[in-house]
From Swiss-Prot:
Part of the 30S ribosomal subunit. Forms a loose heterodimer with protein S19. Forms two bridges to the 50S subunit in the 70S ribosome. Keywords: Ribonucleoprotein, Ribosomal protein, RNA-binding, rRNA-binding, tRNA-binding. Belongs to the universal ribosomal protein uS13 family. This is Small ribosomal subunit protein uS13. It holds the Pfam family Ribosomal_S13. Located at the top of the head of the 30S subunit, it contacts several helices of the 16S rRNA. In the 70S ribosome it contacts the 23S rRNA (bridge B1a) and protein L5 of the 50S subunit (bridge B1b), connecting the 2 subunits; these bridges are implicated in subunit movement. Contacts the tRNAs in the A and P-sites. GO terms for molecular function: rRNA binding; structural constituent of ribosome; tRNA binding. Coiled coil: none annotated.
Length: 121
């Protein structure tokens, strides 16, 4: 298995698909990296030689990926929450941020329904 940016890339996949195993790299960026490195996207990872892998590592190194990207995202959300702005408050409450309705739906963000509390008399 090839190791790029601390991630094992599956051998049986094409280079374009294999690079998407790295957090922060999707299909488009993967294709751009392959073009910049001069590697065919249809080439299987197991067929890449050491020179190709080194070029790919160099190109991937130009982007913020994996732990650094996760850390940056977390810090951005934390900053919003510390500011107390609308988006930060919504993050804190675990509600949708972008104006979606919450009277119904929004189950993914709000979590499973709680049982209705019965009124005692």
């Amino acid at each position: 298995m090839a190791r790029i940016a601390g991630v094992n890339i599956p051998n049986h996949q094409h280079t374009e698909i294999g690079l998407t195993a790295i957090y922060g790299i999707g299909r488009t960026r993967s294709r751009d990296i392959c073009v910049a490195a001069g590697v065919a996207f249809s080439k299987k990872v197991k067929d890449l030689n050491d020179a190709d892998l080194e070029k790919l590592r160099e190109e991937v190194g130009k982007f913020i990926v994996e732990g650094d990207l996760r850390r940056e995202t977390t810090m951005n959300i934390k900053r919003l929450m510390d500011l107390g702005c609308y988006r930060g408050v919504r993050h804190r409450k675990g509600l949708p941020l972008r104006g979606q309705r919450t009277r119904t739906n929004a189950r993914t963000r709000k979590g499973p329904r709680r049982a209705a509390q019965s009124l005692k008399k």
